[in-house]
Design a protein with these regions (language model features):
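C-terminal cap/linker of serine protease catalytic domains
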Residues: 14-29, 100, 104-155
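Catalytic nucleophile loop of clan PA
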Residues: 81-104
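Short beta-strand micro-motifs in enzyme catalytic cores
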Residues: 6-8, 74-77
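A structural micro-motif recognizing beta-strand termini
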Residues: 11-16, 78-84
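Structured core of small recognition/catalytic domains
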Residues: 71-75, 90
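Serine endopeptidase catalytic core focused on the charge-relay Asp
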Residues: 1-69, 94-95
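Short Gly/Pro-enriched loop/turn and capping motifs at secondary-structure junctions
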Residues: 50-51, 83-84, 105-109
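Short, solvent-exposed coil/turn segments
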Residues: 3-5, 72, 85, 113
Length: 155
Protein backbone atom coordinates (compact mmCIF):
# COMPACT_ATOMS: atom_id res chain seq x y z
CA UNK A 1 0.00 0.00 0.00
CA UNK A 2 2.76 2.49 0.81
CA UNK A 3 4.34 2.04 -2.64
CA UNK A 4 1.72 4.46 -3.99
CA UNK A 5 0.96 6.47 -0.86
CA UNK A 6 3.55 9.25 -1.17
CA UNK A 7 1.85 11.98 0.80
CA UNK A 8 2.79 14.88 3.05
CA UNK A 9 0.62 17.15 5.16
CA UNK A 10 1.17 20.80 5.95
CA UNK A 11 -0.15 22.12 9.25
CA UNK A 12 -1.05 25.79 9.11
CA UNK A 13 -0.87 27.80 12.30
CA UNK A 14 -4.40 29.13 12.98
CA UNK A 15 -2.95 32.66 13.07
CA UNK A 16 -1.75 32.23 9.46
CA UNK A 17 -4.84 30.66 7.85
CA UNK A 18 -5.97 33.99 6.35
CA UNK A 19 -2.58 34.30 4.60
CA UNK A 20 -2.97 30.99 2.72
CA UNK A 21 -4.92 30.54 -0.50
CA UNK A 22 -5.53 26.90 -1.42
CA UNK A 23 -6.43 27.78 -5.04
CA UNK A 24 -4.37 26.20 -7.82
CA UNK A 25 -2.44 29.00 -9.62
CA UNK A 26 -3.72 29.66 -13.14
CA UNK A 27 -6.69 27.28 -12.91
CA UNK A 28 -8.44 28.02 -9.60
CA UNK A 29 -10.15 25.30 -7.64
CA UNK A 30 -10.20 22.75 -6.23
CA UNK A 31 -13.96 22.73 -5.90
CA UNK A 32 -13.86 19.64 -3.69
CA UNK A 33 -12.56 16.11 -3.76
CA UNK A 34 -12.85 14.50 -7.20
CA UNK A 35 -13.68 10.85 -7.64
CA UNK A 36 -11.53 8.19 -9.29
CA UNK A 37 -10.37 9.11 -12.79
CA UNK A 38 -10.36 6.82 -15.80
CA UNK A 39 -8.02 6.35 -18.75
CA UNK A 40 -8.43 9.29 -21.13
CA UNK A 41 -9.75 11.74 -18.53
CA UNK A 42 -8.38 15.29 -18.65
CA UNK A 43 -6.17 16.51 -15.80
CA UNK A 44 -4.86 19.94 -14.82
CA UNK A 45 -1.97 20.91 -12.56
CA UNK A 46 0.53 23.62 -11.75
CA UNK A 47 4.16 22.85 -10.90
CA UNK A 48 6.65 25.38 -9.60
CA UNK A 49 10.00 23.59 -9.57
CA UNK A 50 13.07 25.77 -9.17
CA UNK A 51 14.58 23.74 -12.04
CA UNK A 52 12.37 25.78 -14.42
CA UNK A 53 14.52 28.82 -13.49
CA UNK A 54 11.50 31.06 -12.96
CA UNK A 55 9.94 30.40 -16.38
CA UNK A 56 6.32 30.39 -15.21
CA UNK A 57 4.93 29.63 -18.70
CA UNK A 58 6.07 26.02 -18.14
CA UNK A 59 4.20 25.70 -14.84
CA UNK A 60 0.53 25.20 -15.92
CA UNK A 61 -0.14 21.66 -17.12
CA UNK A 62 -2.95 19.94 -18.97
CA UNK A 63 -2.89 16.27 -19.86
CA UNK A 64 -4.56 12.89 -19.83
CA UNK A 65 -4.77 9.90 -17.54
CA UNK A 66 -2.97 7.02 -19.28
CA UNK A 67 -3.63 4.21 -16.83
CA UNK A 68 -4.45 3.40 -13.23
CA UNK A 69 -1.89 1.38 -11.24
CA UNK A 70 -1.43 -0.06 -7.78
CA UNK A 71 -5.01 -1.21 -7.44
CA UNK A 72 -6.27 2.37 -7.78
CA UNK A 73 -3.69 4.02 -5.51
CA UNK A 74 -2.06 5.89 -8.40
CA UNK A 75 -2.60 6.91 -11.99
CA UNK A 76 -0.08 7.50 -14.73
CA UNK A 77 -0.58 10.82 -16.52
CA UNK A 78 0.98 12.60 -19.47
CA UNK A 79 1.00 16.40 -19.60
CA UNK A 80 2.42 18.72 -22.27
CA UNK A 81 5.11 19.82 -19.81
CA UNK A 82 5.68 16.90 -17.44
CA UNK A 83 6.23 17.34 -13.74
CA UNK A 84 9.92 17.39 -12.85
CA UNK A 85 11.88 17.10 -9.60
CA UNK A 86 10.68 19.91 -7.37
CA UNK A 87 7.06 19.59 -8.57
CA UNK A 88 6.37 16.68 -6.21
CA UNK A 89 3.22 17.23 -4.20
CA UNK A 90 1.60 19.42 -6.86
CA UNK A 91 -2.15 18.96 -6.89
CA UNK A 92 -3.96 17.47 -9.88
CA UNK A 93 -7.54 18.41 -10.75
CA UNK A 94 -10.09 16.74 -13.02
CA UNK A 95 -12.05 18.58 -15.73
CA UNK A 96 -14.63 19.84 -13.22
CA UNK A 97 -12.04 21.14 -10.73
CA UNK A 98 -12.21 18.20 -8.34
CA UNK A 99 -8.91 17.38 -6.61
CA UNK A 100 -7.86 13.89 -7.70
CA UNK A 101 -4.25 13.52 -6.64
CA UNK A 102 -0.75 14.71 -5.93
CA UNK A 103 2.30 14.32 -8.15
CA UNK A 104 4.55 11.69 -6.64
CA UNK A 105 6.82 10.29 -9.37
CA UNK A 106 8.60 11.23 -12.58
CA UNK A 107 8.94 8.19 -14.84
CA UNK A 108 11.83 7.21 -17.06
CA UNK A 109 10.41 3.77 -17.86
CA UNK A 110 8.16 2.19 -18.98
CA UNK A 111 6.39 5.45 -20.02
CA UNK A 112 9.15 8.04 -20.30
CA UNK A 113 8.09 11.56 -19.37
CA UNK A 114 4.96 10.45 -17.57
CA UNK A 115 4.10 11.21 -13.97
CA UNK A 116 2.65 9.12 -11.19
CA UNK A 117 -0.22 10.88 -9.47
CA UNK A 118 -1.27 9.36 -6.14
CA UNK A 119 -5.03 9.11 -5.51
CA UNK A 120 -5.87 11.92 -3.09
CA UNK A 121 -9.09 10.39 -1.78
CA UNK A 122 -7.25 7.23 -0.79
CA UNK A 123 -4.39 9.23 0.72
CA UNK A 124 -6.79 11.23 2.89
CA UNK A 125 -8.64 8.06 3.95
CA UNK A 126 -5.29 6.45 4.86
CA UNK A 127 -4.20 9.47 6.90
CA UNK A 128 -7.52 9.65 8.76
CA UNK A 129 -7.53 5.89 9.45
CA UNK A 130 -3.99 6.23 10.83
CA UNK A 131 -5.11 8.83 13.36
CA UNK A 132 -3.91 11.89 11.45
CA UNK A 133 -6.87 14.17 10.73
CA UNK A 134 -6.63 15.34 7.13
CA UNK A 135 -9.04 17.18 4.85
CA UNK A 136 -9.03 19.03 1.55
CA UNK A 137 -9.56 22.78 1.59
CA UNK A 138 -11.45 24.07 -1.43
CA UNK A 139 -9.93 26.89 -3.44
CA UNK A 140 -11.23 30.44 -3.22
CA UNK A 141 -10.90 31.07 -6.97
CA UNK A 142 -13.34 29.50 -9.48
CA UNK A 143 -11.98 26.61 -11.53
CA UNK A 144 -11.29 27.36 -15.20
CA UNK A 145 -9.99 24.40 -17.28
CA UNK A 146 -8.06 26.63 -19.71
CA UNK A 147 -4.33 25.98 -19.97
CA UNK A 148 -3.85 28.77 -22.54
CA UNK A 149 -5.47 31.24 -20.14
CA UNK A 150 -3.33 29.89 -17.31
CA UNK A 151 -0.19 30.42 -19.41
CA UNK A 152 -1.27 33.84 -20.69
CA UNK A 153 -1.97 34.91 -17.13
CA UNK A 154 1.66 34.11 -16.33
CA UNK A 155 0.65 31.30 -13.98
Amino acid sequence: MCDYNDFALVKIDPADVAKVNPSVPGFGGPVGLGGPSATGDDVFSYGNSSLRLGITYLSPKQGKVVTTVGGGWSRTVYTATPGIPGDSGSGFLNDTGGAIGTLSTVAIAPLAGSNGVAALGRELDYANASGTPAALESGTEPFTPDVVGAIAGGG
